[in-house]
Each structure stands twice: as structure tokens, then as C-alpha cells.
Amino acid sequence: FRLNTLAIIFFLILSCSKDIPTQDNLTLDIEFNELGSDGPYLYGETYYGRKSYITYYPGNIPVILSIPHGGDISPSEISNRTYGVSVTDSNTIELGIAIRNYFYSNYNVRPYLIINNLKRTKLDANRDKVEAAQGNLFAERAFDEFHFYINSARQEIINNNSTGFLFDIH
């Protein structure tokens, strides 16, 4: 009896010590559209990343406005970041749109505008990807979209003008 009891206790301890999978260490079988599959990007149109976490307005002058920290979307599929700065830059989306509209009203041109609509607690698009998304697959996708749109605008500016300006609005 004593030997059986010890064997059962040993088995229970051994079986309970196994790692229980969590969302962070599970491999999720999720496929995203290829970056750029929503292009080519045309002036006057608006483009959205997955679930509208990122918004891209192509421009027609060699100026890019980047808004990495102004969003207010807080989806449950993206866990809160646990380290790094998480304070939202207030009114930066409104400022970027106002600047873009000012250029149009006064000069009939518009800069490129890329907006991160996620709260900074979910994604900090101005950090390296590890700190920015902290391992969340959906935050990483939004990060990739944000930077893809910036690089698309940058490449178009280089192709058409050879040089331009990028203003990162905070």
C-alpha cells in the first residue's frame, strides 16, 4: 500500500509539473494578407491595415506625417504592454489631420499621413518591434503595417522627388 501511495504521489507531482500552454507560448495558426496587397496606393484614397489599427493617406508632396502614439483603440486581442512608455500623445491625430487639411486648403496639396490608431498601451510604433509589440502577434502585424506604409510613402517620394521630409508628430 505504501509503495502504491508513493507511486501515485510521484505520478501526480510529475504530471502537475508540466508546463501548461498559455496564449503567449502557443503557436497561433493565423495568416495575414501580404503587406502591400492593398496597393498600389493612390492619392485621394484612404487605406486601412487589419481591423483599421493603422490608417494611411497617400499624399502628393514630399512630406510624410507619422503619428505613432495618438490612437485610442484598445482591442482585447492585444494584451497591454508591460514595459516601456505607455502614455498617449493627446490630440496628435487631430493635429496631423489639421496639418494635412491646411496644406490642401492653402496649396491644393497634401502630405502623406500614417496613423497608429491603437492606444500606446497596446502598441508603441516608435520603438523596436520587441518593445513595441511585446510578442503579441496582432500588435506585431500593426507595427509591420505602420512601417510598411511609411516606407511605401518614402519610396514614392524618393522615386518622384529624390528627397523629402518626415515629421514624427508627438
Name the predicted role of every residue range:
Residues 1-9:
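Sec-dependent signal peptide recognition
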Residues 4, 18-20:
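Intrinsically disordered, low-complexity serine/threonine-rich segments
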Residues 12-15:
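C-terminal motif of bacterial Sec signal peptides marking the signal peptidase cleavage site
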Residues 20-170:
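N-terminal catalytic or cofactor-binding beta/alpha core of small enzyme domains
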